[in-house]
Regions:
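N-terminal, charge-rich interaction modules
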Residues: 1-32
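Beta-hairpin (beta-strand-turn-beta-strand) motif
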Residues: 56, 82-85, 115, 127
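Short acidic low-complexity segments
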Residues: 37-48
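Mid-chain, well-packed structural core segment of small domains
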Residues: 61-93
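Conserved Class I S-adenosyl-L-methionine
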Residues: 92-112
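Acidic/glycine-enriched edge-of-secondary-structure segments
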Residues: 21-31, 46-62
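Class I S-adenosyl-L-methionine
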Residues: 106-132
Length: 132
């Protein structure tokens, strides 16, 4: 992983208030000195500019989306990360099922990126930002 490339794909900057939940150790090591929270710790809804959750099962993804779906500011960068199909990590998550999880908190998927050989990320935005 080349940090600069991943940060650019995710629109991740040092100045943002970041929440990164359930990330694998390799990803956290990759972030280096970048400051981020791994739990909400009493912060109010709408605190974060960047929210990134990692899940390996659909049930876990839905739980994390419900738990952290409102942690970000309105229209924050909200990323749901899941293992790529056919990769090292076995998972029941597919791109379409991530969409379903986002709908639980009235968001829709807008962008997909590859983080590395193992993880994909799907960005969500509030439903009312969807242009018909």
């Amino acid at each position: 992983m080349i940090a600069e490339n991943i940060f650019k794909k995710l629109y991740l900057t040092p100045a943002q208030k970041k929440l990164i939940v359930n990330a694998p150790r390799e990803y956290l090591d990759f972030l280096g000195d970048l400051h981020y929270d791994t739990a909400v710790d009493g912060k109010t809804e709408g605190f974060y500019d960047f929210v990134q959750i990692f899940a390996t099962t659909q049930a876990e993804l839905e739980h994390l989306v419900k738990k952290y779906g409102k942690a970000g500011k309105y229209d924050c960068l909200f990323w749901g990360c899941y293992p790529k199909g056919g990769g090292k990590i076995k998972s029941d998550i597919k791109r379409d099922t991530v969409w379903t999880a986002f709908q639980l908190v009235e968001m829709h998927a807008v962008t997909q990126v590859s983080i590395d050989d193992t993880w994909s990320a799907l960005r969500a935005r509030p439903l009312d930002t969807y242009k018909k």
